[in-house]
Structures are given as C-alpha cells and as structure tokens.
C-alpha cells in the first residue's frame, strides 16, 4: 500500500468498507508496520456519546500516550460522517503530518463538492461499488471466465442470477445462504 495523501473511501452501507479498511490494517501489519502505529476507530460505537473534533483529538492523544507510536501512525476512521467537523480535523492532521488517514462513510456529505474543496490535494478517493455478477459468482465459488465455463452449469448460474436479482449484490448477501423477507 502506498500512502501519498489521505484516503477517502465512500460507498453505500453494507458494501464492505469496514471489512476493506480492516484488510488495509492487516496488510500494513504484514508489511512490517508495527501494531502500535495502526489505529482503527468506528464512530458508530455507542460508547462515543458526543461526536465532535474535540473527541477525535482526545482519541488521538490517548492513543499516542498509551501506545507510543513511532514514526507516522496510520489512522482509520470508519463512519466518520457521524462526527461534526471531521474534515477540518483530517485536514489539520494531514497538514501537520501527524498521521496518514483513511476515512470512510456512507452518506452524501462524503461526496459533497464542499468536502472535495476542503480536502483538495490532500486526499485520494476510493469508491467501491456493490458486486458485479461475475464477482457475485466468485463469492459463491463459481468461476466463469469464458463461455466454455458455462457449459453444463446453466441451472446453477440461473439460480445464482435469481439470488443476485432478488437479494442484491452486497458481499453479505453473496455469502449468506439465508433467505430474507423484504
């Protein structure tokens, strides 16, 4: 993973952003980044009662005090749209080179022009969409790379297509065998 700037991840709810961020943390750890240099905060945690930039700074200060990161820490802020003013805090942290930051959220504020202006030149955008049908098949352990792969598997592919159309294309649905009522 390369981190030239902060990273903004925006995609719909249940599309796997928390999972992807945790994979990023794991990958950094595998690449030799010390665990004390990795901080993951989920702002939907009910233990956070007042969500503002003061809380973000308190979290960062407590993290530094107790884990003593060396070098530049990586901070992952999940569902950051819950915190009023978070974008100014991220900009300040980036400008002061205090951390490399990944933010994720699932509302329109993360996509706003105002936010793009506020973080211009300071971030990269990563947008993840729900699964394509081919990805959905792969999640269900079926690989279809050519028309020959379909031969003799039409019934199973049709069953999965029905599931894809009826249930949606989010990873959680693809991995579930449960049928849900709407």
Question: What is each model feature region?
Answer:
Residues 6-10:
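Short hydrophobic/aromatic beta-strand immediately N-terminal to the Walker A/P-loop
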Residues 13-14:
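Walker A (P-loop) phosphate-binding loop of P-loop NTPases
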Residues 17:
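Conserved lysine of the Walker
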Residues 20:
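Hydrophobic positions on the alpha1 helix immediately C-terminal to the Walker A/P-loop
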Residues 39-71:
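Short glycine-rich substrate-engagement loop in P-loop NTPases that contacts/grips substrate
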Residues 92, 109-125, 137-142:
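Short regulatory helix/loop adjacent to the ATP-binding pocket of P-loop NTPases
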Residues 100-106, 127, 136:
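Structural recognition of the conserved hydrophobic beta-strand(s) that form the central parallel beta-sheet
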Residues 134, 138-182:
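Interdomain hinge/linker elements that couple catalytic modules in large macromolecular machines
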